[in-house]
Amino acid sequence: MSTKTNSTKATSEKTDSLKTNRGTKSSAGYSEQNTPLGGCILADTPITFNENKPVTKVKVRNTGDRPIQVGSHFHFFEANRALEFDRAAAYGKRLNISSTTAIRFEPGDETEVPLIPFGGKQTLYGFNNLVDGWTGEGVVPNSERPDKLEAIRRAAERGFKSSK
């Protein structure tokens, strides 16, 4: 019985020492030494993202009868056909919002959204298969065949609404 008590006491002392020997709080909050397990250490200044990318603003109207949600990394040009906006201006762009988030468009609502160009190789596949290739601007990389006009034609042919 005393062994069990000693073992429990030793464990308790170990836990207490972990709690008390973690350092002191800095003026900004917790330091790495005293942050509770699972806690976060935040920077003194806000984290910014996409600050060096050109922003294109487009007005979007949901002409459908149901809410439509578009995620942060969806090729906005290929978004739901009931959304009416300047699709040509949205070619090769995504929403300028945090990763893993989305914007919801209620039926009949009209709102302006910020778009930024995709990063990396700017080659997009899937979505609604309107593009399936390079969407960048400027010098065309080897083996890429940009065809923005063809993608715009396909979108109109398949009933994707556009304001222009």
Curated annotation (Swiss-Prot):
GO terms for cellular component: urease complex. It catalyses: urea + 2 H2O + H(+) = hydrogencarbonate + 2 NH4(+). It comes from the Bacteria. Pfam families: Urease_beta. It is found in: Cytoplasm. GO terms for biological process: urea catabolic process. Belongs to the urease beta subunit family. This is Urease subunit beta. It comes from Yersinia enterocolitica serotype O:8 / biotype 1B (strain NCTC 13174 / 8081).
